Amino acid sequence: MRVSPLLSLFALAAASAAKGRPKQREVSPVFNIDGKNQYFAGTNTWWMSHLTSDADVEQAMSQIADSGLKVTRVWAFGNTNTGADQPVYFQFLDTTKKTITINNGTNGIARLDAAVAAAEKHGIQLVLPMLNNWDDLGGINTYCAYFGCTHESFWTHAEAQKAYRDYVTFIVNRYKDSPAIFSWQLCNEPRCQNCETSVITSWATELSSFIKSLDPKHRVSLGDEGWLCSDDTSLGYAYSCSEGIDFEANLKISTLDYGTVHMYPIGWGYTYPWGNQWIRDHAALALKYGKPIVLEEYGVESTTSNRTAVLQQWQQTIIDSDIAYDSFWQFGTNLPSGANPYDDYAMFYGTQEYQDVVIDHAQAISKKAVSTAARRRASSRRPN
């Protein structure tokens, strides 16, 4: 999802503890997490790595763990061309001096260190996207401002790709020994309009293989929205390949360990009930290809009168299907510093709505039995 730029926050550095972790294993189409093959729930906290108060990070991560959630998705990117347009940033692509540097200051990579350390402390695992399709916190366009590419040409631009791989190498090597890593993610919602779908598929194939060469122990995911390709035009936008993504082709990439799906029916021109079909369509592909599939973003705006009912219906469909885990967009809490990095989709910890939609669902999905058929595939699906 696109997000709004962060607000004014306090700065304080923290170091991440480095601990070994065994190679991850899956029972397809589910994950092995905490040493057990199971279904579970997670959330999104894109802002966790951009908080400048350790107390804020600690409270949020503690409450996520207290909710019974296993995974949260945190932005591992923060690019800038000026060094002054973001209160926290990790990478400075200076278009004036023509230099690319990592921000090692207290408002730099130390903030991602703090998020990883808090996740380790509370037993939460992290999905870490390392690039944004959108302009929030930098994104692809900061690379293109530096190298003179376009959004469409970025995916095949040799110099831009080398710079991104250098950043990926830095992030993966920094955290690959952490027990908090669930998945390295190539990009948040990659799109390439007016491109053949093979452009993103080739990019994802090459980059995921590169990451596996750096760290064969951990999962790698694409971070796409799950766009499907169909000749049936009556199915509409989500099945039209118009964003340059072919979910099914990408699911076949051997160095991607699972598929990702996002879901915002109203914004895409559908109704809320349509979301149930979107879930089922992707769950069927999990069985077809023997790979876990994650509904890693879904939400309903707080102004929607029947929000709880809509979310609960989707969650029941998730439980009734073969979606490995789901992560609602997004977790909200009243942070000690007063920071408010949320949008209208946030579900706030401590409210009745949060109990009904988040905690109750986490408990329900954790009780779902892994099928005997899935268990028989135990040794065949593990990160490459």
Residue ranges and their predicted role:
Residues M1-G20, N384:
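Fungal secretory targeting signals
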Residues R2, A364-K368:
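Secondary-structure junction/capping motif
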Residues L7, G78, G267-W268, S380-R382:
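Intrinsically disordered, low-complexity segments enriched in polar/charged small residues
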Residues S16-P22, R375-S379:
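Short Lys/Arg-rich cationic patches that frequently serve as NLS/NoLS or arginine-rich RNA/DNA-binding motifs
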Residues R21-P292, S302-I365:
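Active-site mouth of glycoside hydrolases
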Residues L295-Y298:
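Short acidic/histidine-rich active-site segments
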Residues K368-N384:
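Extracellular low-complexity, O-glycosylation-prone Ser/Thr/Pro/Gly-rich "stalks"
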